[in-house]
Design a protein with these regions (language model features):
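DNA major-groove recognition helix of helix-turn-helix/homeodomain DNA-binding modules
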Residues: 47-62
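Residues that mark the junctions of alpha-helical repeat units in TPR/alpha-solenoid scaffolds
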Residues: 73, 108-110, 130-131, 153-156, ...
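"A position-specific structural signal for the A-helix of alpha-solenoid helical repeats
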Residues: 9, 75, 79, 109-120, ...
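A short, Lys/Arg-rich alpha-helix, primarily the initiator
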Residues: 1-16
């Protein structure tokens, strides 16, 4: 019952904002799946719901989510990855990332992994160029033709925006201060 209302709410907001089904679903799920979510026929896992809702410009922190066992296990795996990176256990983090990658091919999860790998790369001294490539790989999980110079043309979730912000940070670190300043402005203007 709860998913019916949350899916219907996504549909109502999408329709109010005149966003096409395909535009909102781009890279996250099929348009048929989104239509089933909006009609209440199908529920969405938390990461998918959050991404759809955030692409509509809404905050997901007001929702309480009940996770099934699989979602809960994936959440714990993401927490373990973050803890390993934060605690400097980089080889453990790599193992956790590899195990997570084997367990899923979902674009949102792959995007998360690219962001985690980039953080790991930064902490272990990888080049700025390699980090940029990893971040672009992540954003292109959902937007294959993504153009960093035109972020206003996309509906971005919080995870996607984190990729963009980190990418611009890498541009700044590579010495392209003027380009980074322009892109930071684009991020601030993003609505």
């Amino acid at each position: 019952m709860k998913m019916f209302y949350s899916g219907k709410f996504i549909g109502d907001v999408r329709n109010t904002q005149n966003i096409k089904l395909a535009e909102l679903a781009q890279g996250l799920c099929s348009t048929a799946q989104l239509a089933r979510i909006e009609s209440g026929v199908r529920s969405a896992e938390k990461l998918l719901f959050d991404s759809l809702y955030e692409r509509l410009g809404k905050n997901t922190e007001r929702f309480t989510a009940y996770l099934d066992c699989d979602e809960y296990e994936r959440l714990l795996a993401r927490i373990r990855i973050c803890c390993c990176i934060d605690e400097g256990r980089y080889s453990d983090a790599r193992e956790q990332i590899a195990a997570y990658r084997k367990a899923t091919k979902n674009n949102i999860h792959m995007q998360y992994l690219c962001l985690a790998e980039c953080e790991l790369m930064q902490k272990t001294g990888s080049s700025v160029s390699a980090c940029k490539d990893k971040l672009m790989e992540g954003i292109r999980c959902t937007y294959p033709e993504f153009d960093i110079d035109n972020i206003a043309g996309y509906y971005l979730s919080r995870l996607e925006m984190l990729h963009v912000q980190q990418y611009v940070n890498c541009i700044e670190q590579s010495g392209q201060k003027d380009r980074a300043a322009k892109l930071y402005g684009d991020i601030l203007d993003y609505t």
